[in-house]
Amino acid sequence: MVTQILGAMESQVGGGPAGPALPNGPLLGTNGATDDSKTNLIVNYLPQNMTQDEFKSLFGSIGDIESCKLVRDKITGQSLGYGFVNYSDPNDADKAINTLNGLKLQTKTIKVSYARPSSASIRDANLYVSGLPKTMSQKEMEQLFSQYGRIITSRILVDQVTGVSRGVGFIRFDKRIEAEEAIKGLNGQKPLGAAEPITVKFANNPSQKTGQALLTHLYQSSARRYAGPLHHQTQRFRLDNLLNMAYGVKSPLSLIARFSPIAIDGMSGLAGVGLSGGAAGAGWCIFVYNLSPEADESVLWQLFGPFGAVTNVKVIRDFTTNKCKGFGFVTMTNYDEAAMAIASLNGYRLGERVLQVSFKTSKQHKA
């Protein structure tokens, strides 16, 4: 496939940059970039059978790559059709956009753009939908909501055993105003084939007031506990990470900052104390993968607490080193809240790691 890709490049880009890519896709980019994001690209509409090596080979032909990741489904391992590339040189990133944007690969026309920084107009555009007919497909749900704006991602939650829809879904729009219009138009309405009205509301992100309270607590805690040369850097990491969680802000620091045990320690006061690490009790058990070796239980409390009642968290540690083995478990009492947490945190970037979050199955690691 690599040979075919390079051949396609030669035939398509000889006359200059290709035309615009298709208008809809899983994630967003921007035609411009801030000084801190001129090396980080998002690539949409990749062929599903494209491998990580082929993805790296394609973009590595432009210049030196710091990192690249083809995003895959956490369960099936199949490509989700998009990925991220971070170049060493901003000029190479710009060249990749001019050279590869609009490149046709198999039946796809790829879109290459700068990873879009957050802004008020695009934040919090994720909707939670309940009461959907069990027979409604993801495509039908998208058709229902597409009249209100551009849909970025959609998902219908299914039973892990039977594969049957739970009647709960998520829709992420391009802009918040589109999500607001969808709520006005569809909340309380009966779609075709529905016996009951559906509920459409914003996914349960922490409110601005809650976020501000967290920030205040965090700064007070850090001021008491840390001083010296590390204080400012640690404080900045905490602020960035908390903003990322509370407001959906994806600032450059969160993309490159290493996961710091010092920073996490400062968050422990926000999550409560007296955590026990035994087996999960009654409720919905969530599997969290790709945690840092330095991660502890306070990380999981801090991540999942804003979505609802958490009864237990557990980080699985190596017996010899006492370091996190890369995964842990969270138990939440309410299914809808657990589902919202999964939909919001799966793919969440924590430090340099992208978390994989799903309902626990028998195939996954056991505590």
From Swiss-Prot:
Cellular compartments per GO CC: ribonucleoprotein complex
A GO BP entry: cell differentiation
Domain RRM: 39-117, 125-205, 284-362
Tissue: Brain specific.
Keywords attached to this entry: Developmental protein, Differentiation, Neurogenesis, Repeat, RNA-binding
GO molecular function terms noted in the UniProt entry: mRNA 3'-UTR AU-rich region binding
Domain-level remarks: RRM 1 and RRM 2 bind cooperatively to AU-rich sequences in target mRNAs. RRM 3 binds to poly-A mRNA sequences.
Family statement: Belongs to the RRM elav family.
Function comment: RNA-binding protein that binds to AU-rich element (ARE) sequences of target mRNAs, including VEGF mRNA. May also bind poly-A tracts via RRM 3. May be involved in neuronal differentiation and maintenance. Plays a role in the stabilization of GAP43 mRNA and in spatial learning.
Subunit annotation: Interacts with MAP1B light chain LC1.
This protein's name: ELAV-like protein 3
